């Protein structure tokens, strides 16, 4: 008799039980690992699968996390074979090519499209009912690509979008007012990154509109220069990259925030990237961030934001830029 047999006597033969809340992270780079640890520490799933083409890095990261199993409640698995991801509820895609020095954005996009042509069909094969969350950049275009390649309905393909931009925005407003970010209600919509749109008309604390107190807020004529905050939001990522080489923690926490709303069916409103054709005067098939309701079925509803004419115009301009890039892609 083995030690195990001497120690344990079976009462019944256990049937294999599938995971009830499995999450997969594709890509074990800085963003993938920050997302993984954020999901683990928030205890959002009973199984976390990780997949990447870089076998040694993947194996090392999985082992490192598994060594902390005592401190977690989640089963952690990893393999370069996508079968390890089977029956995931949410699949987070962080994999993608990095921008080379002097490389055009369009060229980077096409390289990432080619990577997605391998990743997305594999996800669909093993988790045909999952909710796809795209984090790889440029996120709005790649969410469109994932939607096209997956054949999924639009409510099951979500881009992490401006969830992080809005978090940065609220943090900086909080710094200026000496308040916690959760008490500063503010939204950034549109394209994630350089041409994002801050909705100054909606910024409020305890229901008090800041633009009501300072009608010039967010404009060039504002003596308090609130507009600089949005510039800080846009420059924030570049600043972090300059200082530490990449961004990871905040985007990882942002991903876990979105995963939580889906897994726990919270019906919470987040600014995430979705198909905005027909909204705010957008005519083309593009994905941009608007406030959306996230729950167990994915993206269930879109909130109709009241935007000023100037804000709407910025949104349409972003849409045109994205469509210009998308129509050149070979899918």
UniProtKB/Swiss-Prot annotation:
Transmembrane segments: none
List of residues binding substrate: 105, 137, 168, 247
Keywords assigned by UniProt, alphabetized: Cytoplasm, NAD, Oxidoreductase
Classification via InterPro entries: L-lactate/malate_DH, L-lactate_DH, L-lactate_DH_AS, Lactate/malate_DH_C, Lactate/malate_DH_N, Lactate_DH/Glyco_Ohase_4_C, NAD(P)-bd_dom_sf
Residues that, per the record, bind NAD(+): 29-57, 98, 137
Class of the enzyme per the UniProt entry, highest EC level: oxidoreductase
Locations listed in the record: Cytoplasm
Active site per the UniProt annotation: 192 (proton acceptor)
Any one annotated GO CC term: cytoplasm
Extent of the signal sequence: none
Superkingdom of the source species: Eukaryota
The enzyme's E.C. designation: 1.1.1.27
PROSITE patterns registered for this protein in UniProt: L_LDH (PS00064)
Subunit text: Homotetramer.
Family: Belongs to the LDH/MDH superfamily. LDH family.
The name this protein goes by in its record: L-lactate dehydrogenase A chain
Origin species: Lindbergichthys nudifrons
Gene field: ldha
